[in-house]
Amino acid sequence: MSTANTSLSQQLDEKPWVDASDNSSVQEYQGFDATASHNIQDLARKLTHGSTNGDHHSANDLARYLSHMSDIPGVSPFNGNISHEQLDPDSENFNAKYWVKNLKKLFESDSDYYKPSKLGVAYRNLRAYGIANDSDYQPTVTNALWKFTTEAINKLKKPDDSKYFDILKSMDAIMRPGELTVVLGRPGAGCSTLLKTIAVNTYGFHIGKESQITYDGLSPHDIERHYRGDVIYSAETDVHFPHLSVGDTLEFAARLRTPQNRGEGIDRETYAKHMASVYMATYGLSHTRNTNVGNDFVRGVSGGERKRVSIAEASLSGANIQCWDNATRGLDSATALEFIRALKTSATILDTTPLIAIYQCSQDAYELFDNVVVLYEGYQIFFGKASKAKEYFENMGWKCPQRQTTADFLTSLTNPAEREPLPGYEDKVPRTAQEFETFWKNSPEYAELTKEIDEYFVECERSNTGETYRESHVAKQSNNTRPSSPYTVSFFMQVRYVIARNFLRMKGDPSIPLISILSQLVMGLILASVFFNLRKSTDTFYFRGGALFFSVLFNAFSSLLEILSLYEARPIVEKHRKYALYRPSADALASIISELPVKLLMTMSFNIVYYFMVNLRRTAGNFFFYWLMCASCTLVMSHMFRSIGAVTTTIATAMSLSTVFLLAMIIYAGFVLPIPYILGWSRWIRYINPVTYIFESLMVNEFHGREFECGQYIPSGPGFENLPVENKVCTTVGSTPGSTVVQGTEYIKLAYQFYSSHKWRNFGITVAFAVFFLGVYVALTEFNKGAMQKGEIVLFLKGSLKKHKRKTAASNKGDIEAGPVAGKLDYQDEAEAVNNEKFTEKGSTGSVDFPENREIFFWRDLTYQVKIKKEDRVILDHVDGWVKPGQITALMGASGAGKTTLLNCLSERVTTGIITDGERLVNGHALDSSFQRSIGYVQQQDVHLETTTVREALQFSAYLRQSNKISKKEKDDYVDYVIDLLEMTDYADALVGVAGEGLNVEQRKRLTIGVELVAKPKLLLFLDEPTSGLDSQTAWSICKLMRKLADHGQAILCTIHQPSALIMAEFDKLLFLQKGGRTAYFGELGENCQTMINYFEKYGADPCPKEANPAEWMLQVVGAAPGSHAKQDYFEVWRNSSEYQAVREEINRMEAELSKLPRDNDPEALLKYAAPLWKQYLLVSWRTIVQDWRSPGYIYSKLILVISSSLFIGFSFFKSKNNLQGLQSQMLAVFMFFVPFTTFIDQMLPYFVKHRAVYEVREAPSRTFSWFAFIAGQITSEIPFQIVVGTISYFCWYYPVGLYANAEPTDSVNSRGVLMWMLLTAFYVYTSTMGQLAISLNELIDNAANLATTLFTLCLMFCGVLAGPNVIPGFWIFMYRCNPFTYLIQAILSTGLANAKVTCAPRELVTLKPPMGETCSSFIGPYTEAAGGYFSTNSDGTCSVCRIDSTNQFLESINALFSQRWRNFGIFVAFIGINIILTIFFYWLARVPKGNREKKMKK
């Protein structure tokens, strides 16, 4: 029944939205806002306009509608006192249709108060354009700089029109309020771009100046600036906060769109809760109210329910114009139909204007649409009434095949290989997209459309729609909201609601704040124990300063990972901004406020324990000031890191920048480089460094006004025991000759240039920094739109791109309009399609034949069960079947019937549960160890490495999965053959890439199939939902491809979800499972599925209508479609049928006869893997190296971090002198060299996880290569890059610091330089192995990063720099000895500092007076000879003493002996080996499936 012939009353009565007894079904309702109060005259006009049966019929419809409305109470459903159960969303009798009618009548009762609004859209000459690159080359490490430089220069040049191409060619359309429009086209046709343009969501492309778009008189600028939430674009992806419940997610959206004019006495909370409940009841989500939304990694609602949450959230925005981009993705056809009915009802009753781009649209769904837009490569080839589109194209000369849906027919016209002209019209119909458009623009339908649009534009200019709409918009807004604002509630109300949502997120996953607080407490205990109970003496001055410095360092570091949560939330915040729910700045401010309690608890849990265990100044005032400054440090650094995150577009860039900034702040805080020793060029850094002011205040707070007993005197030791005090001096800076104490104030003044008067001043400066960075962060969030989405392009290697462009130029002959833009790879012209079809049928390489398969795989009584909540549940129940060469068997069933489970059981891929009964046989024999290598399994997900080309992916599979006896040339020839067979020649050298920049959906699916085919599966090919998520034409082409493979002798078993009649015709047999994994049918389909139809009709099914889709009819018959019920149990019908007996007899016959055939006794056929281990290892390692090489972002971010940090440290400590502070600085330069450790690991982890995902999801189950080859390849392939990085770091750090100069006196510059290079490169190799160890036993990157950070922090603390072995408590001494950094630092310091002379700076000399009658030589000489150091005699007779004269004395004090440098290097290398061994062990322990499920079954 077409839309044109459907009256309003029929829509309301014959297609009810909701079955009151089934709250789980998707019910028809969409969009609640002030548009509900349109007057009856508008409704009558629309009805009259839409009717094809005359005015009398329309009048009857209107009268009937008014009669229905008279029965509606028109009461407010929001006040909580709901007298009608049909209006209560929590009632089982809730009726969404009744609820909407009631709401409409309520609004009509006081239209002046509710101020209803509606919005249509019309456009003429609409053109969208972007950069003319539908193909580009993949940057590598060698050409990336050149590419980025040329792109930057091109941006600075005057725009060149030749660089742009039209995504949407000039087009015209009008969508009036109350009309539902569908947009049809193949992927890349411009459907998404059209919807984004209408929704004023044009970031990433441009709109032509000649384009005219009006929204009932409003311009796109008006919509973007003032009414953004009234015109929305809903993307096909589902992004939500995973730890927020469904109810909280929808109530949050409802609160932010709650209007001011919601009715008297109704508070916002009541209104929002009621609206959210209505939507949950309408879309069958009520039972999920308290369930987390979840995502791919967090358990939550199902994928289909998550899609419905997205739909409900978008609907709650109350938008007048809704642009839905493939919103039915992930929904089965019945649920999708219910959603479209909801859109239709929304348009009909509430006068909304929905547009939807949809794939695989059923006929029932299509008949609900008022208008249809058909796009072909960016050209609009039709716009008009949906009921007239088919007739238009048939009149053009195209044939619509029997049982093909209208939507599929319209879309198929844009596919040259699929469309079919009527006899006699072969030379008359248009062929190219431009010819189709020319035909359309010369048609009378187009002339009528342009006339209607022109009249609409004139009407918009005459009417005062803008002011009326503004009044309606302002009436909805809360108090203190600017009338020009697109938001419904005020800024501070937005902040309040987002704060509440953030607390709910914490409640949904309290583990994150709890673990953060507990980890801070544990780290406080561990770190404080290192400096435990410091004595109040001068020999603890360095350690006391080090303890304060590390507390600042830890508090600053604690906010670094906030960048990750910022990027995680950014897509959701951007979506909500487009829905006009709240400003990004409101979210920024709210996130800081909501996280403040957790931050304060974190600082308390660390700092309270740390402060008192270290024995810092124990007075209340000093403690609270310390805690105040540490909390301020956390806030300042949090705001700074957030600002960096807000100004960048990638996590890698943000983390690298943050690390360099943090490094600068630590070095110039005043401890690592005290102010007197900061070089002149860099003094400005300390003035803009907030950590400098914080550290100075903490040092003043600890030392000012205190006296410390001297811990060590000069001279001291044997012979000086009874020396009077006036003749000795304390060794500490700031000491006074003859005094037994040192003034703390004097010490920090002379050693650090810290002044007590700066204490509270610095606090004020810190607060100013916090406010400044807060303002910067909040402001930046408003302007950062994230990485710009590029158009769909295909990436090649640079050399391959040149060949591709030459080929494209030759085929297009310079005319961009002659075919696809810039040689677009998605489409071919008709001649190419025909030629390619003929070419591939013959095969391009006559010497290569498809593997002949004569073996038959069959199974009998297969039963599988899993344990769920301590209960064994049967998933498959005695399933029988077979797959023969040359046949395609379809595996169908309802969701949850066990289709994928059956595939996994048949292919031996089950990882849980037990096969309790049944046999799986090949030619009558049990499965052997080579079975998994003998099959191909095409998974539903297309999992590939993004930097691999199509040809490389196929070659990799062929090299490792084909027999090792076959030569490389033969394998390469076979790969070429499969490329031709799958019609992938045009993009064989293209990279897989990512969505938008790489292969499209169809090309990825073909590659997935190809990877399995090149393995030469001699037995059969499994395909799991190969058409899922594809448009109907792509699904059809995949099925044609399967048919071609079967015709070449391949046996195929394929699961498929509700196929069209055309797709069903490609299958030979059907195995249908009903709920519980029970067989309802197994047998031939027959021509037009007649054999299957006859079977069900024979056993009592209603006859199949001639025009019906047999698949959908069968689903209705067996009760597998939503809302349908079977007349009988078809499992029992099957088991008692003669057809079942025939199947059993055939299985028994095959077992008896086939088992007599000779078996393949080739020993290689029984191997678990086709290739030997060494070959697996080499190929996997090389692939990983190539992946890194083609990921210049990864390599350059690593290089930039290494070069910037090494140079920064090197020049900050530039040619440090060999005095007391200089030695200290050189040691801390080594310490700071290790600080970027965690960032190196954070950069590496995502790439490891990408490889692991491909291996574990696809390559491991197919026995491509072993787990040992995978982990070994990952480890060793990273080492060459680390050696290069270490070499660069060596030159950037070692020479600027000046350590090489210490080797000059002993003429050992070369030997010590080589050892230093080995040490530094070993450090970088260690970082990669540590990262791989952390991720080897963790599923999530965050957990691995946290583990690595914790281990790294402990290594730094116990390495002997901040606290030596003589200070570390005895309990922790094992941490010092088993710490790899201990030996590395000792080796680096001994190699860099040994055997050099020390000369104290003047401020480092201590002065003392010799006893009466003695000279400096006689008095101090014996001491310096025994203890080391040197002295000089001053003019006044006093002695100036430097306590050391050789770097070896300093090295001995920190246990870094030059004689042990090679031993220490060897120990550190051993730690690298331990990392590698543990990585392999933990990967095997945590990730490799153990045991043999076949053995378990036999037990």
Swiss-Prot record:
Residues 1-511, 784-1193 are cytoplasmic. PROSITE patterns: ABC_TRANSPORTER_1, ABC_TRANSPORTER_2. ATP binds at G893, A894, S895, G896, A897, G898, K899, T900. Gene3D superfamilies: P-loop containing nucleotide triphosphate hydrolases (3.40.50.300). It is found in: Membrane. One of its GO terms (cellular component) is plasma membrane. One of its GO terms (molecular function) is phosphatidylcholine floppase activity. GO terms for biological process: xenobiotic detoxification by transmembrane export across the plasma membrane. Residues 148-402, 857-1101 form the ABC transporter domain. Multidrug efflux transporter. Confers resistance to azole antifungal agents, to other antifungals (terbinafine, amorolfine) and to a variety of metabolic inhibitors. Belongs to the ABC transporter superfamily. ABCG family. PDR (TC 3.A.1.205) subfamily. This is Multidrug resistance protein CDR2. It comes from Candida albicans (strain SC5314 / ATCC MYA-2876) (Yeast). The lineage of its organism: Eukaryota, Fungi, Dikarya, Ascomycota, Saccharomycotina.
